[in-house]
Swiss-Prot record:
Cross-referenced NCBIfam families: PRK00026.1, trmD
Family statement drawn from the similarity comment of this UniProt entry: Belongs to the RNA methyltransferase TrmD family.
Subcellular localization, as worded in the UniProt entry: Cytoplasm
Primary location class: cytoplasm
Disulfide feature: none
Example of a GO cellular component annotation carried by this entry: cytosol
Binding site for S-adenosyl-L-methionine: 112, 132-137
Gene source species: Geobacter metallireducens (strain ATCC 53774 / DSM 7210 / GS-15)
Name of the gene encoding the protein in the UniProt record: trmD
Name listed for the protein in its UniProt record: tRNA (guanine-N(1)-)-methyltransferase
Residues spanning the membrane: none
SUPFAM superfamilies tied to this protein: alpha/beta knot
Free-text function comment from the UniProt entry: Specifically methylates guanosine-37 in various tRNAs.
Catalysed reactions, as listed in the record: guanosine(37) in tRNA + S-adenosyl-L-methionine = N(1)-methylguanosine(37) in tRNA + S-adenosyl-L-homocysteine + H(+)
Superkingdom to which the source organism belongs: Bacteria
Length: 245
């Protein structure tokens, strides 16, 4: 999978994109990430990439010309790449969006900055916009990193265990169950006995119920779209009845 990132601050990506799973994916040839400095495509001698907004107002707006020139240079090599914009106006980037994006071969992400970007970038080039949450960031770079990290987990061969992406939190609409490893006891806190029993059916049942408990406690809104069977619904009813007593 190929990512091209259009940004004013390419150095921000050096740590997150050169460590851990992403680094190994790049080394194995499963992932290709290229950074493009938008400022390099400004044509004036001062390399200006922003200007005051028409109509007045606070902040500065990223100019359309440098972004267009940078994007067109990338598209000359990646004509089929899907063009995305990180923006608070975009749809929420979630696990389903990450899975969807992983089906693409080539993706271009434009990182917004300052007060925003000239609207003509959207009108002329952008195919989709994503937000990672209802909060303000200094720029779209952090959002782009989050999107890449979440997406590459669904690229075949990236994770060590093929099933990891399918059992992670949100994979079936629920928060994930608690995890434990050695030692079996630490400062009076023991690993649940069922996890040491060797009974795979009981372990699976415990994990499913804990996932339901975590979800109803922290993110009950997720249950509206979660994939639930009759046992799940019965257990949720028990939890609700217990909470009302």
């Amino acid at each position: 999978m190929k990512f091209d990132i259009l940004t004013l601050f390419p150095a921000m990506f050096e740590g997150p994109l050169t460590e851990s799973i992403i680094r190994r994916a790049v080394e194995k040839g499963l992932l290709d990430i290229r950074l493009h400095q938008i400022r390099d495509f400004a044509t004036d001698r001062h390399k200006v990439v922003d200007d005051a907004p028409y109509g007045g107002g606070d902040g500065m707006v990223m100019k359309v010309e440098p972004i267009a020139a940078c994007l067109e240079a990338v598209k000359a090599e990646r004509p089929k790449a899907r063009v995305l914009l990180t923006s608070p106006r975009g749809r929420l980037f979630d696990n389903a969006a990450a899975r969807e994006l992983a089906q693409e071969q080539e993706v271009i992400i434009i990182c917004g900055r300052y007060e925003g970007i000239d609207e003509r970038v959207r009108e002329l080039f952008v195919e989709d916009e994503f937000s990672i949450g209802d909060f303000v960031l200094t720029g779209g770079e952090l959002a782009a990193m989050v999107m890449i990290d979440a997406t590459v987990r669904f690229v075949p061969g990236v994770l060590g265990s093929p099933g990891s992406a399918e059992t992670d939190t949100f994979s079936d609409g629920l928060l994930e169950y608690p995890h434990y490893t050695r030692p079996a006891e630490f400062r009076g806190h023991s690993v649940p006995a069922v996890l040491l029993s060797g009974n795979h059916a009981e372990v699976a049942r415990w994990r499913r119920r804990k996932a339901l408990e975590e979800t109803i406690r922290s993110r009950p809104d997720l249950l509206e779209k979660a994939v639930l069977d009759s046992d799940d619904r019965r257990y949720l009813l028990e939890l609700e009845e217990g909470a009302s007593k």
